[in-house]
A protein has these predicted regions:
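A short helix/loop element that forms part of the nucleotide-sugar donor recognition site in Leloir-type
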Residues: 167-185
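A conserved, positively charged/aromatic
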Residues: 76, 103-137, 141
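Nucleotide-sugar-dependent glycosyltransferase donor-binding/catalytic pocket residues
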Residues: 8-12, 118, 162-165, 197-201, ...
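A short, active-site helix/loop in glycosyltransferases that binds the activated sugar's phosphate group
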Residues: 130-168
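A conserved mid-protein helix/loop that constitutes part of the nucleotide-sugar donor-binding site
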Residues: 13-21, 190, 194-213
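Short hydrophobic "strand-cap" motifs at the C-terminus of beta-strands
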Residues: 6-7, 112, 135, 194-198
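N-terminal strand-loop element at the rim of the active site
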Residues: 5-66, 153
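Short His-centered aromatic/hydrophobic patch
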Residues: 86-92, 113
Length: 219
């Protein structure tokens, strides 16, 4: 099969990391994989595993970017995807326009809700898909509540990761020595970690409240 993923850019982030990981897995299974984005630090990793990247300036939400639907349509004609996987709201709108100029036998469209999107009308583009992926039960219930979609089309699929790179094993002795050399104040302390960007909706406020209640001599 030929699978194309669509997102604003390939900077370092969870959505972007998942895009690259899925693309690599698809190529290992013998599928043809492509990604459309404005580029970024993870772009080279696509070519490393044999995927194709189409560069399109769709990272900024403006009128010039929405006009890229014509160029996106040409990419579709060139790559001939069987499945289009949209991962962000603004590119999803561009996708809606691009598909209008294609023949009646259009690709299957899959969208992934990566969070609790605000502005329901603007986010409605993510519901214009044959099937929808929700990354958690909370997100799935949010989609049911805020979007007029058939529940059978919304599938709960938890976010996966490359367990070779993101593993739960203890760090090596060399890594630990390097850490304590750089942060000696953490020696003999229990370390708590909240992976992810520093943003409110990822629970950073709750994490800070937790830290304030702990014994600072131990943590």
């Amino acid at each position: 099969m030929r699978i194309l993923q669509l997102l604003p850019e390939l900077k370092l982030g969870g959505v972007e990391r998942g895009t690259v990981d899925l693309s690599e897995h698809l190529t290992k299974l013998g599928h043809k994989s492509a990604v459309v984005s404005a580029g970024g630090g993870l772009t080279e990793q696509l070519s490393d595993h044999g995927a194709k990247h189409f560069s399109l300036p769709i990272a900024k939400k403006n009128f010039l970017a929405i006009k890229q639907y014509k160029n996106l349509r040409e990419i579709y004609r060139e790559f001939k995807p069987d499945i289009i996987h949209v991962r962000s709201r603004f590119p999803a709108w561009i996708n809606v326009l691009a598909l209008k100029g294609l023949p009646s036998s259009k690709p299957i469209v899959i969208s992934t809700f990566h969070g609790l999107y605000s502005k329901p009308f603007y986010s409605k583009s993510m519901s214009y898909a044959d099937d929808i992926i929700a990354i958690s039960k909370t997100v799935q219930e949010y989609v049911f509540k805020n979007y007029d979609v058939d529940r059978s089309r919304v599938h709960l699929i938890y976010r996966g990761c490359d367990i070779d790179e993101f593993n739960a094993s203890a760090p090596s002795e060399a890594w630990s020595n390097s850490w304590y050399k750089e942060f000696p104040q953490t020696s003999d302390k229990i370390l708590l970690t909240l992976p992810g960007r520093i943003t409110g909706w990822k629970g950073i406020e709750d994490f800070l409240k937790l830290l304030s209640q702990l014994d600072q001599a131990k943590y």
